[in-house]
Design a protein with these regions (language model features):
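Conserved Rossmann-fold SDR core element
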Residues: 157, 167-182, 224-231
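Conserved glycine-rich cofactor-binding loop
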Residues: 12-13
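Conserved glycine-rich Rossmann-like NAD(P)H-binding loop of the short-chain dehydrogenase/reductase
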Residues: 26-42
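C-terminal substrate-recognition "lid" of short-chain dehydrogenase/reductases
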Residues: 209-231, 236-237
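Substrate-binding pocket helix/loop in short-chain dehydrogenase/reductase
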Residues: 78, 92-102, 196
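Conserved NAD(P)H cofactor-binding loop of Rossmann-fold oxidoreductase domains
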Residues: 84-90, 234
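Catalytic loop of short-chain dehydrogenase/reductase
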Residues: 129-169, 181
Length: 250
C-alpha cells in the first residue's frame, strides 16, 4: 500500500529530526527539507523505511515555492506540510535589529505561509490535507527578548485561523503547534538547559517526542481546523519577564 507523504521543513536537526523519525516509524513517506544541513538530512533519510531529501534556503521564497510545486506534481498522496524550520537570533524590544527582523519575518512567517498556500492549492491527497505551523509558547507568554523572532511567530500564528477559514473542504485543516523550552537554544550549555527547561508549570523537562506525538495526532486524528496546541508543560501559563535562557543565568 502506498504511504502518505509528509514534508517537514528543517528536518535535519533538533525537533525536525525527531519529527522525521516519528513519522517514518508510523508508516509515512517522509520528505526531509534541509537548508545548510543536507548531509545530516541524508543520514536520517537512510534510516527511514521511505524517505527523500529536498534542499533550499527558505530565505528565498520563490525557490521554496518551486520546491512545493515540484512535490505537488509528483507525490500522489501528499497529506501533510509541517513548517518546522525557523531562525532564532537575538535582538530586543528596545533595539530591533533590522537584518535579524527581515530574516525572521521571511523565514519564520512569509515563506511558510506561502508554502502552505501553495500546498493547499496544488497538492494531491487522499482524505484531506493538513498544514501544521510550528509556533512558540511565546505567542501566549511573550517577553522582550528575541524580539524579531517573537514578532514573526505571532505573525505566523495569526495565519492559522485565517487559512483554516479559507478552506472549503472540511477534511483539509490548518493547525498551530506551540512548543516551549525543550532543547538547548542559542548559546546555552546543557547545565543551563537543565534549569531553563524546567521553568514551566509542571517543573519538568518536556520530551521532544511529546511534540512529535502531537504532530502525528494532528496529521491523522480529529482536531478542529484552526486550533493551536501547546506542548510546553504549561510554560505559557506562567508570567516570565525574560526568555528562560536568560532567567536560568540569574
Amino acid at each position: 500500500m502506498a504511504r502518505p507523504a509528509v514534508l517537514i521543513t528543517g528536518a535535519a536537526r533538533r525537533i525536525g529530526a525527531v519529527l522525521a523519525r516519528r513519522f517514518g516509524a508510523a508508516g509515512w513517506h517522509v520528505v526531509l527539507h534541509a537548508g545548510h544541513s543536507v548531509s545530516a538530512a541524508e543520514d536520517i533519510s537512510a534510516t527511514l523505511p521511505s524517505a527523500e531529501v529536498v534542499a533550499c534556503n527558505l530565505i528565498d521564497g520563490a525557490v521554496a515555492l518551486d520546491m512545493v510545486e515540484d512535490l505537488a506534481a509528483r507525490l500522489d498522496d501528499w497529506r501533510v506540510l509541517i513548517n518546522c524550520a525557523a531562525v532564532f537570533k537575538p535582538d530586543s524590544a528596545d533595539a530591533l535589529n533590522p537584518a535579524v527582523f527581515a530574516e525572521a519575518m521571511r523565514v519564520n512567517a512569509e515563506t511558510p505561509t506561502r508554502m502552505a498556500q501553495a500546498f493547499l492549492a496544488d497538492a494531491r491527497a487522499k482524505g484531506g490535507k493538513r498544514v501544521i505551523h510550528f509556533l512558540d509558547m511565546k505567542i501566549a507568554n511573550p517577553n522582550p527578548d528575541f524580539f524579531s523572532y517573537t514578532m514573526a511567530k505571532h505573525a505566523l500564528a495569526s495565519t492559522v485561523k485565517m487559512l483554516a477559514m479559507a478552506q472549503s473542504d472540511p477534511a483539509t485543516r490548518v493547525y498551530g503547534l506551540a512548543p516551549g523550552a525543550m532543547l538547548p537554544s542559542h548559546d546555552q550549555v546543557s547545565e543551563e538547559h537543565e534549569i531553563s527547561g524546567r521553568m514551566n508549570l509542571l517543573q519538568r523537562l518536556t520530551d521532544p517526542e511529546e511534540l512529535a506525538d502531537a504532530a502525528l495526532f494532528m496529521a491523522q486524528g480529529w482536531l478542529a481546523s484552526g486550533e493551536t496546541l501547546f506542548v510546553d508543560s504549561g510554560q505559557h501559563l506562567l508570567a516570565q519577564p525574560r526568555d528562560v535562557l536568560y532567567l536560568a543565568r540569574q
